[in-house]
Amino acid sequence: MPAYELSAPYTPKGDQPTAISKLVEGVNGGERYQTLLGATGTGKTFTMANVIAQTGRPALVLAHNKTLAAQLCNELREFFPHNAVEYFISYYDYYQPEAYVPVSDTYIAKTASINEEIDMLRHSATRSLFERRDVIVVASISCIYGLGIPSEYLKAAVPFKVGETLNLRGSLRDLVNNQYSRNDTEAGRGRFRVKGDVLEIGPAYDDRLVRVELFGDEVEAIRYVDPTTGEILQSLDAISIYPAKHFVTPKERLNDAVKAIRSELKERLEFLNGEGKLLEAQRLEQRATYDLEMLQQIGYCNGVENYARHLAGREPGSAPECLIDYFPDDWLLIVDESHVTCSQLLAMYNGDQARKKVLIDHGFRLPSAADNRPLKSEEFWSKAKQTVFVSATPGNWEMEVSEGQVAEQVIRPTGVLDPLVEVRPTTGQVDDLLGEIRDRASKKQRVLVTTLTKRMAEDLTDYLAENKVRVRYLHSEIHSIERIEIIQDLRLGEYDVLVGVNLLREGLDLPEVSLVAILDADKEGFLRAQRSLIQTIGRAARHVEGKALLYAETMTDSMAKAIEETERRRKIQHTYNEKHGITPTAAGKKASNSILSFLELSRKLKADGPDADLVKVAGKAVQALEEDVDGLALDALPELIDQLELKMKESAKKLDFEEAANLRDRIKKLRQKLVGSSR
């Protein structure tokens, strides 16, 4: 019997039953690669859910960005309310990797800001994979990075069972070894406290406390309790408390790792000295020797991940263990928006290695640091035994490896046709667009506008705002959770128009959007290629009055093919509707917000509103950069710090580490002044 319980107020319709049947048959028959070629709004996620439910396997649903992953997680949680649907993305709010710039002899240390709530969700995912089979993990591409050793993580879990004798001192020691800290004053995630015969633990994977009640040496009761009120939420017979970090190194393995690091250091120093690189040799010896001392004394050092190969006991060049290795052997991979996601897999490894090579060549790291890396594309696919690619525009590679195992899904259960596509001249495009926006807004419909450049998007947003249009600009500096909030606000009618560059194409489920406007549609390139145009047009495919405006002076080959494919689908859909007497109806899908609700960040993000006066604030920040810190007004400091952090993150993304480091130092100075003023 399948382990999943699919809950939905409707049954498969249109060509969904055929697609589901073909994909399930392929999975059960051992097909390695299959493709679901589904037009936007045809219910691809519902088809995916049915395939997962009918095959009964643990599943990894891979998305190409955090926003899409959150949306998929929300939808799958609605389909599987009684099963484990987990969310696994990068837990960094900000991450600047360690780097060295030889031209200016500048070393930049790693700096990062970890989102504790997302870290909790990551631990929840791995815990579910150990304890049950009805697990769906929705992940971003960050799942291909190293994640400890699953066998050691499982082995290190501290068990508690009602009725069994407990060595309390031994359990406390095990918790400390698993990187939990004792705090008898304040309980919380990653901490524990002891009061008499009661042990309370804040597991890494939950925001509830685990209370273990003892009678002498015997476990009398185990309960989940509310950390704030102390209310008993659930009684348990047994529980395993997994480590607070995924990276767990037993003492004997740590000793072996130290020996291996010393051996590699000796060999590398001989090489550098032989090459006459005396400065590099001295630098490496000093850094590595200090790290070794820290590892021996406390089992940890800054940059410990650079010794991951030795700590895991892996061979040189071998693949790291990642989230995939926490799955059982018969797991199923579903790659959403595969034409984008598969390309990301190719790029991650190369970018990581280029940066590390500079650090190794200049004596900042041992060569083994290069093995602290994401999976190579071929390593990833060797671990994925069965895959279903999902896309409205699958790439050539996916279609090739699927070898005819393609299920096409064109008919929408709602009967809604693909959008009408109209080409209009670029002359006066902004004023023409303004009129269209006002018309749609009067009907309480939403509009998406995509431009070619960030500057154009900013200018258009300003212009629309000046003309009393409720508009927001979705840009790359916005944190993942806030991005979800902005999209939710569009759906809820907080504003009518969302402007962006390359953030509005794949997978965003926005039934309220009736108009998509593509400015400069005839400018050939990645953003105006056939696949990109089809995806962007598809953002209006869930609305009965869906329409796409392409502003262009000439008809490019990409435009012609995109329009031709859209018309082909419209004809198929129209014929099906006539044959079955179907009248197109609105999707009526509620604006789910479960991820934000779970993290309890929704209202906080709305209150922060960092983009409301983005242009004005950025101007103040630039001006302040040229002024002496001592001359700044105190009430301007928080605003300035926020903007400098945005600039710092943008610089890090562009690999301009010198500028990012300068901004980081500036931020520290401003914060010191702010703290000093409050004393």
From Swiss-Prot:
Q: Does the keyword Nucleotide-binding apply?
A: yes
The UniProt record lists the UVR domain at: 638-673
Superkingdom to which the source organism belongs: Bacteria
Q: Domain named Helicase C-terminal: which ranges?
A: 429-591
Using the UniProt record, give the first listed, main subcellular location.
cytoplasm
Q: Which UniProt keywords apply?
A: ATP-binding, Cytoplasm, DNA damage, DNA excision, DNA repair, Excision nuclease, Helicase, Hydrolase, Nucleotide-binding, SOS response
Domain Helicase ATP-binding per the UniProt entry, residue ranges = 25-176
Q: Where is this motif: Beta-hairpin?
A: 91-114
Q: Which family does it belong to?
A: Belongs to the UvrB family.
Oligomer status and interactors:
Forms a heterotetramer with UvrA during the search for lesions. Interacts with UvrC in an incision complex.
Q: What is known of its domains?
A: The beta-hairpin motif is involved in DNA binding.
- Protein name in UniProt: UvrABC system protein B
Q: Which gene encodes it?
A: uvrB
